[in-house]
Swiss-Prot record:
Coiled coil: none annotated. Its main location: plastid. This is Photosystem I reaction center subunit IV B, chloroplastic. Pfam families: PSI_PsaE. The lineage of its organism: Eukaryota, Viridiplantae, Streptophyta, Embryophyta, Tracheophyta. It comes from Arabidopsis thaliana (Mouse-ear cress).
Length: 145
C-alpha cells in the first residue's frame, strides 16, 4: 500500500483461530474503510462462518422437516383504536389549559396504552407562547358532534 493511501484509508482483517476456544468452528471477519473523497468510496463488511459438513442422518431429517408444512401462527386481531379519530373536533376539559372549554381538532392519537397524553389537538387560536397545539389525556378531551 502506498504511503499516500495509507493516510487516507485502512483495511482491518481479523482471523480468530479455533484453537483459542477449543471449538472446531472457524469464523472470518473482514472490515475495510476506504477514503471518502473518491466517488467509488464504499464500506465492505464480510463475515463468514464455516459449519461442519452434514452427515447422512441429519441430511435426511432436514429434508423431512422441509417437506412438512410450516405452521404459521395465527395473527392477532387488532385492538380497537384508542381515543377520538383523527380530524374530529374535541372540547378540552383540563382546567389549567389555556384552551379550557374551547374546541380544537385532533391531529394524531398515539395508540400505545402506556402514553400519558396520547391525543394531540390543534387550535385556531394561539396561546401566549404562540403555540397552537397541545397533548391531552383521554379523559381530558370530549368529542363534539
Amino acid at each position: 500500500m502506498a504511503m499516500t493511501s495509507a493516510a487516507t484509508g485502512f483495511i482491518l482483517t481479523a482471523n480468530v483461530p479455533a484453537a483459542i476456544g477449543g471449538g472446531s468452528s472457524k469464523s472470518t471477519t473482514i472490515v475495510s474503510f476506504l477514503p471518502m473523497r473518491s466517488f467509488g468510496s464504499r464500506l465492505v463488511v464480510r463475515a463468514a462462518e464455516d459449519t461442519p459438513p452434514a452427515t447422512a442422518s441429519s441430511d435426511s431429517s432436514s429434508t423431512t422437516a422441509a417437506a412438512a408444512p410450516a405452521k404459521v401462527p395465527a395473527a392477532k386481531a387488532k385492538p380497537p383504536p384508542i381515543g377520538p379519530k383523527r380530524g374530529s373536533k374535541v372540547k378540552i376539559l383540563r382546567k389549567e389549559s389555556y384552551w379550557y372549554k374551547n374546541v380544537g381538532s385532533v391531529v394524531a392519537v398515539d395508540q400505545d396504552p402506556k402514553t400519558r397524553y396520547p391525543v394531540v389537538v390543534r387550535f385556531a387560536k394561539v396561546n401566549y407562547a404562540n403555540i397552537s397545539t397541545n397533548n391531552y389525556a383521554l379523559d381530558e378531551v370530549e368529542e363534539v358532534k
